[in-house]
Amino acid sequence: MAATMIFGSFTHDLLGKAMSTIHSAVTAEKDIFSSIKERLERKRHGKICRMKNGSIYIKAASSTKVEKINAAAKKLADDKAAFLKAQPTIVDKIIVNEKIQVVEAEEVHKREDVQTVFFKKTKKRAPKLRATCSSSGLDNLYNAVANIAKASSLRVEVIHKKRVCGEFKQTRFGRALFIDVAHAKGHRRRIDCRMHRREQRTMHMFMRKTTKTEVRSKHLRKGDSGIVLLTQKIKGHLSGVRDEFFIVRGTCDDSLLEARARFSQSITLRATHFSTGDIFWKGFNASFQEQKAIGLDHTCTSDLPVEACGHVAALMCQSLFPCGKITCKRCIANLSNLDFDTFSELQGDRAMRILDVMRARFPSFTHTIRFLHDLFTQRRVTNPNTAAFREILRLIGDRNEAPFAHVNRLNEILLLGSKANPDSLAKASDSLLELARYLNNRTENIRNGSLKHFRNKISSKAHSNLALSCDNQLDQNGNFLWGLAGIAAKRFLNNYFETIDPEQGYDKYVIRKNPNGERKLAIGNFIISTNLEKLRDQLEGESIARVGITEECVSRKDGNYRYPCCCVTLEDGSPMYSELKMPTKNHLVIGNSGDPKYLDLPGEISNLMYIAKEGYCYINIFLAMLVNVDEANAKDFTKRVRDESVQKLGKWPSLIDVATECALLSTYYPAAASAELPRLLVDHAQKTIHVVDSYGSLNTGYHILKANTVSQLEKFASNTLESPMAQYKVGGLVYSENNDASAVKALTQAIFRPDVLSELIEKEPYLMVFALVSPGILMAMSNSGALEFGISKWISSDHSLVRMASILKTLASKVSVADTLALQKHIMRQNANFLCGELINGFQKKKSYTHATRFLLMISEENEMDDPVLNAGYRVLEASSHEIMEKNLSRTVRDILVRLKLVWKIQVNLVYAKALWKIQSRIVPKRADRLARTLQQLVAVSLPEYAQALEKQGESVSRKIFGKHFKCKTQDNMCSF
């Protein structure tokens, strides 16, 4: 037997028998080389790795990976060999499903240097991938969609040349696909379901997901039309089988019909279809016969078309229960979850539309038309009188006390109309009962009209003012410390009080006059007698004619007494009369119906004695409110009272106006609502409320108002309060009618004084509105640059003032092109409304704000009164007054120009020229009236007059006027800069 010797790649055959020892050695050598070869093979398919210390090594591949690589190489070689051995074929068509991407190969440069441990591996850019979809990928997509549709019972539509629709449903056979067939829609056709090849191929992907349960043909019934079953799983005789799937149409002669197959006309007519319509009519007929009316007085006949009856039944169903399908559980759930109002509204809207259809198409069904009309028109009864509802809500909507609460409830229920439920109707009856009781009691009270049971006693408990009990506001003697409020109180004392000189005596201050009479103060009692008898006589005072409790002493609201707004009585019902109020010095006395509290006036005011001027008595109420106002708000409070409250109240205001103003102030400063009032005495004979200050009252016998705090006094601020005292006079500020004239005069003077004009624009900008008094003043302000300066001054702080200046500048341009004075005045008056709307912006601390708004409102009201007269073709007698006003203003301007020194004239011209340089154009009136000419003369003063004056007064005047920034040059006999 021949043996072979192997050493590496060297092989040699040996003759003869080999010994067993030599054979075992050769086998061992063979095993050694095979393991080395296998290890090298794994190294060859391995990858290069680097260790943490930078060393590079080859990581061998696994045996499994090597086997896969060898198998792939063997398969590639076999395929190539098979391709080469195959017979030649003719290729007539090549179809490329995927787009071929051509990538240019880059030239590869081989590294010639030796790789070291510091070699940096470069990253290779991955080629950009493009989204492509092959036929297999598209099949996978269809398969995934089919799985989702089956799991969620979704509807599927396949559209190519025609639309094929299907839906997965849960059946007794499992979850199956149902294809839409024609006979389910009421059409009997020879082909029940048309499906082209492309549509059928796609639909097969979804048919594969249908149930695979074995089904006997006799188990199929109504409602199974369109179900897709596997042909192999159907037991029974089948007719028209197309492929592996069977779409059920119906039966004919015990044969199951395929929906995609074409059948003869006779089979189509004789076939029993498995649609749900037959089931519906079976249930409909059964229930209709069971519930058929009994005791009819006639024999029923078939008079109306059956198809029309079906239409009407469907319309009735849609009007009562609007839905997409009567078998849809989701529609049923949606209708069940609607509230009554929404469901009724939905029914009503559908019923009204369906009624129109029934009247047009099915007029013979009069009973259904009448039923729907009566049912839904009665359910949709509404109250058309919404204007009355809004008016009631406006009058008493905010009142929650009886009987207004009952009226509001009735008003709301009546608005509901047919939506009112039985509970609401029961509440309406209860409210009506309460109204009847109230009216009955009110009638009885009015009929009696007696005050013998009226009692309004003073509370035995003293009012606790928290502002006077805070340790931080009391000194070591327990006296109230005003703090910063004391400084703000000066605004009251400086404007509305006058000082008393004790050296001149107190006689002239004893009598305080009011519009209806007078009252004696106790200020003369500062000088008292040491004789006890005479002192007791002084303490008696001087009594006025005393009156008892009358209707003027009480205040009612809703038929009930408002006790804080009534006069104080004793236990027997008689009025409590005021006694002598002794005077004190430098005190504020608060506490009306209880024990008085004496507060020292602020130490910042000095030790002078102050007394309110005639008509200013109610300022003591605001001074008492200042005690409870926080120190941080004291300054704003006093400014608001001075600039707004006192301006509106006027002289001797009524009590209702004072109470309303207190309510307004309490809104801005809530702490002031709990402030205690000064002593308030009621004089019914003179219809006056006396606000008693620290100088007391010599007269006695007045009634006492029970209101002790500002919040109680605010109850008078109501139009529904039945109180004669609400119209009593209190006291106020004498308004000066010369305020407008003073404002115009100040504005005119400021035009010729640039420094004054700048200060006026900064501190009282609203005075610029008074330029509407005259067209000449308006144009002069525009030429002087005042409006431009104002716009630049306020552009970042107050946009309303910027709009005001812009409107005035525009008006100046419009007025300059007017031909007559009347037309100029008309232009300014017509724009007053717009300017007023831009100007009014809540409360402003500027003193000129109130005057400016009042001036604009006056012009607006005059326009409102004159417009109907002018539109009717008449003229108002204003032209002559305008001419006179212009003459007076012209005379005033000339007087101002005469008084101006030459230095000021030159400086004014400099300012004008500087302003004109900025605004580039000067407004020149087309009609040069008297005032306009006077104002324009100042602008056009020639340089020779200045040069002559400079020669007389010296060069120092030139430096004073022009400074070091301006130089005077002669050019065309005018001054240029």
Curated annotation (Swiss-Prot):
It is an enzyme of class 3 (hydrolase). Residues 609-731 form the Peptidase C6 domain. Keywords: Host cell junction, Host-virus interaction, Hydrolase, Inhibition of host innate immune response by virus, Protease, Serine protease, Suppressor of RNA silencing, Transport, Viral immunoevasion, Viral movement protein. The keyword Transport applies. Potyviral RNA is expressed as two polyproteins which undergo post-translational proteolytic processing. Genome polyprotein is processed by NIa-pro, P1 and HC-pro proteinases resulting in the production of at least ten individual proteins. P3N-PIPO is cleaved by P1 and HC-pro proteinases resulting in the production of three individual proteins. The P1 proteinase and the HC-pro cleave only their respective C-termini autocatalytically. Residues 132-274 form the Peptidase S30 domain. A motif (Involved in interaction with stylet and aphid transmission) lies at residues 325-328. The record marks 274-275, 731-732 as: Cleavage. GO terms for biological process: proteolysis; symbiont-mediated suppression of host innate immune response; transport of virus in host, cell to cell; viral translational frameshifting. The active site is at residues 183, 192, 225, 617, 690. This is P3N-PIPO polyprotein. It comes from Tobacco vein mottling virus (TVMV).
